[in-house]
């Protein structure tokens, strides 16, 4: 037998019977004549042979170069024309393509006509593989090997050109070749549903080898390098595992490119089950060499890794191929249109000019083709158009762009939504959706959203460009991008319980249309944006929060843009889009006609993600054939979290280390040099542990169910490295345990001088996000703690304050974050000495934010841009949106700017009183009551006209705010009770706040779950000192579920994870068991 594979029993029984027969695993398999002859034409007349065959005689032999015009060639090459007459270009000979020494080996093959049809929206050419049947797949593989092994682009293109010059000039032939060279651009075939992990298991099954064997371990752990082999490339792993098991080239039946294409067609059929896929893979495996298998799996994975970009390959095929592909996203159309266009023009040139004049005319023709007007290309429905893209620009460059405007209404600003860029194609009742990469997303969104499209899109035939996002009708806001496909695919997190009120309850898809490309059988891309928007409004009817048109705001100054960006930040929006109303729609173009403005593009704006020290907790093996493939080249970074803060001895270092765990936070793989990476690898290598989902480490906490897991993990308490990270933005996520992550992180420095205790804590990450999301949204429990979180003080604050970062940057920031340069201000008074003040907003008149900060420094005080535990007062002009979250947290006094002005004018520290207060903490209100009544009327000072006015104003305020002194009395009473009766049996739950799972929508009383069994637990909890909360907030310690109905466990877990709160889930049984035993029972014992 030629194979070293393990066959099924049926194969073994028939081995002797079939050993002399050709391998018929491929239908229409070619039969090889192993006898060598010098007369290659003897069998050409065989009636079964296809009369146009690929001829690869000495294709890469520099002494025998065959050159002829191809689709991309517009000049006639005359070099070595003397050899052309001796070579039959229509017959394939695969013996001496890559071996220049062995020139006498040829093979005769018999082929059968094979034609298959691929169903597409617009079928132009059937998959005719007759010519492909004459091209050995080994020739294609040898071509790829030569390209990948040569580092020079010019040599790569030279190999490709030599191969093409031997290739038959027909559009279908070029298409079948290009879809193998560029499988990632082939949209005719559906997804194979085969990735590295699946393929590895299938190969182990096909080879019938032990999963513990060397070859199996190489496949299953293909990313890992060993002492002898470099990992990171699955194709190479397949080759090494099969090279001693598969066919070799001696006397075998060669598989053709047509055979491979047929197998790929079969694998991509949408209803192909696993058994059928295994059968197809087995046929290919038994008929190919290890080298051919390597390239076969790379085609399946759509990762050729040959060093030639998509654009280089397309441009090599034809100068206008890139433009055509951007318009059609269809390789088949590109090959067809450009081939016939070139052939026609070349024929005209032959009739008009002599051979010596042809070269110059063809050069002119090439220039004309390069200047092809893309707007004259035919637009067809259901052929996705590459979307026009937006450029990134700084504030300074935006000024230049706006100054170049020829009219005051030339530019508009739109909101930038955090969704998926989607192109909607509508032809009557048929609607399709395409992603920005031209992938068909109809299967994902069609069933849910097509009825909305039919209702809202009035045009019969059109192409719309826009953003698909998720609207949450309960929270009344747009969701983050990560929730889009979860909603569309109905992954409600209920784990099959059938509960309709999962994490998707109250959510719906919403399409924000911002452009129209095609309407009424005509492209409108050549119209200016202003006209396209007018057409768009005529073609669409608005349906709130389901199908809308992006709102435009005309701008002509930087101040307007900054104001809009401030609002976007406050509203947690992703950013803005600046568009030129005179711009035409150019597919795949990224220029300043459209500009995206995000907070992270404005350096130093204090978005909370500028400069963080994070510890390495995991590693990832790199993939590919580059220098990082097969090594730990990417890292999972984490932050420490104190798992148990109830111990009183916070200075006990061993106890502190014992209680810390590490939450996963982000993944980084850039910013360091190869030398730095090798140094990290050397230092960390002895400490890595393989990560297993069946036995995850307790010290490293990942988001369940392991949405982002490393290949290896490390215990930072034993050894690790701290990396200084720069990122663009901090965002909410469910991929990491922290609940947040960084966008576009990169390493600034490896901090060998720091350990894990010096890096950012989980508490600080929460503060960073709240700073970014609502400017000054701090949560009291995380910033100051509630008296039980003192242990976190052991974590040193290694990160710079936002104020320091802003000062270091020296760049422009938004007004709400602007730090006034007071380096030249010399304090003239000591009124505010030792007092730290944060100014949020000044008046709109004389006393601006900047002037107030200067006054504070002149009076000896210190100013910051964000309040911290050391900040004494926050200053503002009124109850603006930016301080609402601070008011809700209740931990800091917010004072009117008038107090600063009065202190400055009177040159003394004016006592604070109710008239200055925008918000008073409980302690401040108590202090005020010692000197005056609740309306500010002093017990000591004489009443004046002004003080009486102030008292009346305070009465109005108190009527609105209901700030009564009874609250402080109640708090005092509760504290006293806890002090003297804390150990009594009736105080069992005194430290806990419970949320009872009574409502289908959390906190919504109108959605009460009928026939629940939680009423008794409600009474017991309150009787035994516990508190009940009807809101899901950070004060909750436990969520109580009905022991008889645990269907909502997953929903509650998702809710807790989304808020990143340390809340425990218990059942009514746990409540009763704790009461029966007069002590709090272990929770895990009950839930298990």
Curated annotation (Swiss-Prot):
Pfam families: BRCT, DNA_ligase_A_C, DNA_ligase_A_M, DNA_ligase_A_N, DNA_ligase_IV. Keywords: ATP-binding, DNA damage, DNA recombination, DNA repair, Ligase, Magnesium, Metal-binding, Nucleotide-binding, Nucleus, Repeat. Residues 827-917, 984-1088 form the BRCT domain. Mg(2+) 1 binds at residue 467. Its EC number is 6.5.1.1. ATP binds at residues 414, 416, 421, 467, 514, 574, 579, 596, 598. Residues 25-53, 73-90 have a biased composition (Low complexity). It is an enzyme of class 6 (ligase). Residues 95-105 have a biased composition (Acidic residues). One of its GO terms (cellular component) is DNA-dependent protein kinase-DNA ligase 4 complex. Residues 1-56, 73-117 are annotated as: Disordered. Mg(2+) 2 binds at residue 574. One of its GO terms (molecular function) is DNA binding. It is found in: Nucleus. GO terms for biological process: DNA biosynthetic process; DNA recombination; double-strand break repair via nonhomologous end joining; nucleotide-excision repair, DNA gap filling; single strand break repair. The active site is at 416 (n6-amp-lysine intermediate). Gene3D superfamilies: BRCT domain, DNA ligase, ATP-dependent, N-terminal domain, DNA ligase/mRNA capping enzyme, Nucleic acid-binding proteins. Its cofactor is Mg(2+). It catalyses: ATP + (deoxyribonucleotide)n-3'-hydroxyl + 5'-phospho-(deoxyribonucleotide)m = (deoxyribonucleotide)n+m + AMP + diphosphate. PANTHER family: DNA LIGASE 4. Belongs to the ATP-dependent DNA ligase family. DNA ligase involved in DNA non-homologous end joining (NHEJ); required for double-strand break (DSB) repair. This is DNA ligase 4. It comes from Dictyostelium discoideum (Social amoeba). The lineage of its organism: Eukaryota, Amoebozoa, Evosea, Eumycetozoa, Dictyostelia. The gene is lig4.
């Amino acid at each position: 037998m030629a194979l070293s594979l393990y066959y099924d029993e049926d194969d073994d029984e028939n081995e002797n019977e079939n050993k002399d027969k050709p391998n018929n695993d491929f239908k229409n398999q070619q039969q090889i004549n192993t006898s060598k002859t010098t007369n290659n034409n003897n069998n050409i007349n065989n009636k079964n042979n296809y009369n146009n065959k690929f001829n690869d005689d000495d294709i890469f032999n520099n002494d025998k170069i065959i050159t002829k015009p191809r689709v991309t060639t517009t000049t006639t090459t005359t070099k070595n024309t003397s050899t052309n007459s001796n070579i039959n270009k229509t017959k394939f000979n695969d013996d001496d393509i890559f071996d220049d020494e062995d020139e006498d080996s040829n093979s005769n093959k018999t082929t059968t006509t094979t034609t298959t049809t691929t169903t597409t929206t617009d079928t132009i050419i059937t998959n005719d593989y007759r010519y492909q049947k004459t091209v050995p797949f080994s020739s294609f593989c040898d071509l790829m090997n030569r390209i990948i092994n040569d580092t020079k682009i010019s040599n790569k293109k030279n190999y490709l050109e030599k191969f093409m010059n031997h290739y038959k000039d027909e559009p279908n032939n070029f298409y079948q070749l290009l879809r193998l060279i560029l499988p990632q651009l082939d949209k005719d075939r559906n997804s194979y549903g085969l990735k590295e992990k699946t393929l590895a298991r299938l190969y182990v099954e096909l080879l019938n080898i032990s999963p513990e064997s060397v070859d199996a371990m190489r496949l299953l752990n293909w990313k890992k390098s060993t002492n002898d082999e470099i990992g990171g490339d699955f194709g190479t792993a397949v080759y090494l595992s099969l090279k001693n098991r598969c066919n070799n080239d001696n006397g075998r039946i060669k598989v053709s490119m047509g055979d491979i294409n047929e197998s790929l067609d079969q694998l991509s059929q949408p209803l192909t089950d696993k058994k059928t896929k295994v059968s197809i893979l087995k046929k290919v495996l038994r008929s190919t060499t290890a080298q051919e298998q390597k390239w076969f799996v790379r085609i399946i994975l759509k990762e050729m890794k040959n060093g030639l970009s998509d654009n280089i390959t397309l441009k090599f095929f034809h100068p206008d191929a890139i433009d055509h592909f951007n318009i059609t996203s269809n390789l088949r159309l590109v090959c067809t249109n450009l081939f016939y266009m070139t052939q026609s023009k070349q024929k005209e040139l032959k009739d008009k000019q002599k051979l010596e004049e042809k070269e110059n005319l063809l050069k002119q023709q090439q220039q004309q083709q390069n200047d092809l007007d893309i707007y004259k290309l035919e637009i067809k429905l259901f052929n996705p158009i590459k979307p026009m893209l937006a450029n990134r620009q700084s504030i300074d460059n935006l000024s230049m762009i706006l100054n170049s405007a020829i009219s005051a209404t030339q530019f508009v600003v739109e909101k930038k939504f955090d969704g998926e860029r989607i192109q909607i194609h509508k032809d009557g009742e048929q609607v399709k959706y395409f992603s920005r990469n031209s992938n068909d997303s109809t299967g994902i969104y069609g069933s849910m959203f097509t009825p909305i499209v039919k209702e809202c899109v009035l045009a019969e035939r059109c192409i719309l460009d826009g953003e698909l996002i998720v609207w949450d009708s309960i929270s009344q806001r747009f969701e983050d991008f990560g929730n889009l496909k979860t909603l569309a695919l109905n992954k409600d997190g209920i784990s099959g319980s059938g509960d309709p009120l999962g994490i998707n309850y109250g959510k719906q898809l919403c399409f924000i249309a911002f452009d129209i490309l095609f309407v009424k059988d005509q492209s409108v891309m050549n119209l200016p944006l202003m006209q396209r928007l007018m057409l768009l409004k005529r073609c669409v009817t608005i349906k709130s929060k389901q199908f809308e048109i992006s709102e435009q705001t005309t701008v002509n100054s930087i101040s307007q843009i900054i104001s809009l960006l401030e609002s976007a930040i406050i509203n947690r929006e992703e950013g803005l889009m600046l568009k030129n109303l005179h711009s035409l729609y150019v597919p795949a173009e990224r220029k300043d006609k459209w500009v995206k403005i995000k907070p992270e593009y404005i350096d130093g704006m204090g978005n909370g993600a500028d400069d963080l020290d994070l510890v390495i907790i995991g590693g990832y093996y790199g993939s590919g054939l580059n220098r990082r493939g097969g090594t730990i080249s990417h890292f999972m970074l984490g932050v420490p979290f104190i798992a148990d803060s109830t111990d009183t001895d916070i200075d006990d270092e061993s106890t502190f280390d014992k209680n810390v765990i590490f939450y996963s936070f982000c993944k980084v793989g850039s910013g360091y040099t190869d030398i730095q990476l090798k140094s990290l690898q050397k230092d960390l290598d002895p400490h890595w542990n393989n990560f297993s989902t069946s036995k995850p480490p307790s010290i490293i906490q990942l988001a369940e169910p392991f949405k982002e897991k490393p290949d290896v993990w490390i215990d930072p308490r034993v050894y690790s490295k701290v990396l200084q990270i720069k990122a663009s933005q901090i965002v909410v996520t469910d991929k990491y345990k922290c609940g947040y992550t960084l966008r576009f992180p990169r390493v600034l420095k490896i901090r060998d001088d720091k350990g894990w205790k010096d890096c950012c804590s989980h508490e600080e990450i929460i503060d960073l996000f709240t700073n970014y999301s609502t400017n000054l949204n701090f949560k009291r429990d995380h910033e100051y703690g509630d008296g039980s979180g003192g242990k976190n003080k052991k974590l040193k604050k290694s990160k710079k304050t936002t104020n320091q970062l802003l000062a270091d940057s020296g760049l422009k920031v938004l007004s709400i974050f602007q730090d006034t340069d007071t380096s030249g201000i010399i304090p003239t008074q000591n009124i505010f000495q030792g007092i730290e003040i944060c100014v949020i907003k000044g008046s709109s008149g004389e006393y601006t934010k900047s002037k107030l900060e200067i006054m504070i420094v002149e009076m000896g005080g210190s100013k910051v841009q964000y309040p911290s535990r050391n900040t004494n007062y926050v200053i503002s002009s009124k109850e603006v949106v930016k301080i609402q979250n601070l008011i809700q947290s209740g931990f800091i006094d917010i004072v009117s700017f008038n107090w600063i002005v009065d202190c400055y004018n009177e040159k003394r520290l004016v006592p604070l009183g109710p008239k200055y207060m925008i918000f008073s903490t409980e302690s401040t209100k108590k202090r005020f009551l010692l000197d005056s009544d609740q309306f500010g009327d002093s017990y000591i000072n004489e009443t004046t006209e002004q003080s009486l006015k102030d008292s009346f104003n305070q009465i109005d305020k108190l009527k609105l705010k209901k700030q009564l002194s009874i609250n402080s009395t109640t708090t005092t009473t509760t504290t006293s009770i806890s002090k003297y009766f804390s150990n009594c049996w009736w105080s069992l739950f005194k430290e806990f706040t419970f949320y009872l799972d009574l409502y289908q929508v959390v906190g919504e009383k109108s959605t009460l779950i009928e026939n629940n069994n939680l009423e008794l637990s409600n009474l017991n909890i309150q009787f035994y000192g516990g508190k009940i909360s009807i809101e899901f907030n950070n004060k909750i310690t436990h969520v109580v579920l009905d022991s008889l109905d645990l269907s909502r466990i997953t929903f509650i877990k998702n809710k807790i994870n989304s808020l990143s709160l340390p809340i425990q889930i218990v059942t009514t049984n746990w409540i009763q068991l704790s009461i029966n035993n007069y002590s709090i029972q272990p929770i895990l014992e009950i839930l298990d």
